[in-house]
Amino acid sequence: MTTETISGITLTTKANVYFDGKCISHGFTLADGTKKSAGVVLPSQLTFGTAAAEIMECVAGSCEYKLDGSDQWLTSKAGESFQVPANSKFDIRVTEAYHYICHYA
């Protein structure tokens, strides 16, 4: 299932811009205090670090990702998600715009 709209949020209007503009996101908070972000990764190969555990939900496009300690690239496309442990990192490879929601666990 792909999340298309989210109601009742507080949006951080200033964008987070990473990797010279290859990843742009906006943070938001749900009514219950849960924090998330929504963004896009443009065609590139990047490495992200995590503090909290994350669930990356693909809402459009697709990506290949490789979790820390793995040599295997896996694919995530619209309607799918993947989990990244806390205090870890992951590589992401994108050939078309990858739109996502990051759920912090």
UniProtKB/Swiss-Prot annotation:
Keywords: Glycosyltransferase, Transferase. One of its GO terms (cellular component) is cytosol. GO terms for molecular function: guanosine phosphorylase activity; purine-nucleoside phosphorylase activity; thymidine phosphorylase activity; uridine phosphorylase activity. It is an enzyme of class 2 (transferase). Its EC number is 2.4.2.1, 2.4.2.2. InterPro entries: Ppnp (IPR009664), RmlC-like_jellyroll (IPR014710), RmlC_Cupin_sf (IPR011051). Gene3D superfamilies: Jelly Rolls (2.60.120.10). It catalyses: a purine D-ribonucleoside + phosphate = a purine nucleobase + alpha-D-ribose 1-phosphate; adenosine + phosphate = alpha-D-ribose 1-phosphate + adenine; cytidine + phosphate = cytosine + alpha-D-ribose 1-phosphate; guanosine + phosphate = alpha-D-ribose 1-phosphate + guanine. The keyword Glycosyltransferase applies. Pfam families: Ppnp. PANTHER family: PYRIMIDINE/PURINE NUCLEOSIDE PHOSPHORYLASE (PTHR36540), PYRIMIDINE_PURINE NUCLEOSIDE PHOSPHORYLASE (PTHR36540:SF1). Catalyzes the phosphorolysis of diverse nucleosides, yielding D-ribose 1-phosphate and the respective free bases. Can use uridine, adenosine, guanosine, cytidine, thymidine, inosine and xanthosine as substrates. Also catalyzes the reverse reactions. Belongs to the nucleoside phosphorylase PpnP family. This is Pyrimidine/purine nucleoside phosphorylase. It comes from Delftia acidovorans (strain DSM 14801 / SPH-1).
